[in-house]
């Protein structure tokens, strides 16, 4: 093989960014099959599964964006798309917890590397991002999770979207139930307390993102409890 031919072969085989067509197809799926955060898994499976598969194929061979916000957006969209695919692949279970290995055994390829959902979140996204707001952008397929947006993430809109997702979750009965002197929080704040800086960091984070009146009503040392997590599938 000539050097020119070898160079061409390596170029064609090298990972590339997720192409615009695949991203547009994924955006179309979200717009069509997500309403108020709930997913029409049956409709997606029956009508447009090849488009989801096409997007995940593009994710599998993509290179990781170098820019921080773009890489975070890539990981978030990949995670959420994999959840959609995995729910459908397992026959739309009543709960993702009914599927053994849903998070820690089922493997998908992201940017050329085999990974599970747990590994994608805990070994790739979280250590790279060091931003606890990502917990409110990742959608695990359960009612207790943050809701799935009908629009993909991008590097350009990441900051605003993470803030919006965090505030939306904390002002929902699933995320936080605040009153004078006490607050009940999603178990996310218990499971991932370390990402928020421990118990004190959790309260600082919650105060920062709650509406001002609710944050003030908590007082200096509010009683903190945790809401039972609803693992029912987030389907329409």
Residue locations for each model-derived region?
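Interaction/scaffold regions that mediate signaling and macromolecular assembly across diverse proteins
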Residues: 16-236
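Hydrophobic helical h-region of N-terminal Sec-dependent signal peptides
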Residues: 4-12
């Amino acid at each position: 093989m000539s050097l020119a031919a070898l160079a061409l072969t390596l170029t064609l085989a090298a990972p590339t960014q997720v192409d615009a067509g695949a991203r547009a197809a994924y955006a179309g799926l979200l717009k069509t099959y997500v309403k108020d955060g709930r997913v029409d898994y049956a409709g997606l499976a029956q009508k447009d599964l090849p488009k989801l598969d096409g997007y995940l194929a593009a994710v599998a061979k993509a290179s990781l964006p170098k820019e921080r916000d773009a890489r975070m957006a890539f990981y978030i969209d990949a995670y959420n798309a994999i959840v959609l695919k995995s729910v459908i692949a397992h026959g739309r279970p009543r709960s993702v917890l009914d599927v053994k290995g849903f998070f820690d055994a089922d493997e998908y390829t992201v940017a050329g590397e085999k990974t599970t959902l747990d590994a994608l979140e805990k070994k790739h996204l979280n250590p790279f991002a060091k931003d606890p707001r990502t917990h409110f952008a990742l959608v695990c397929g359960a009612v207790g999770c943050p809701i799935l947006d009908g629009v993909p993430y991008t590097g350009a809109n990441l900051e605003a979207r993470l803030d919006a997702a965090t505030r939306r979750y904390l002002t929902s009965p699933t995320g936080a139930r605040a009153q004078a002197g006490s607050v009940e929080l999603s178990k996310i704040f218990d499971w991932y307390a370390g990402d928020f800086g421990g118990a004190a960091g959790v309260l600082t984070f919650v105060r920062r993102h709650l509406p001002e009146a609710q944050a003030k009503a908590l007082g200096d040392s509010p009683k903190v409890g945790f809401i039972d997590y609803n693992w029912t599938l987030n389907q329409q």
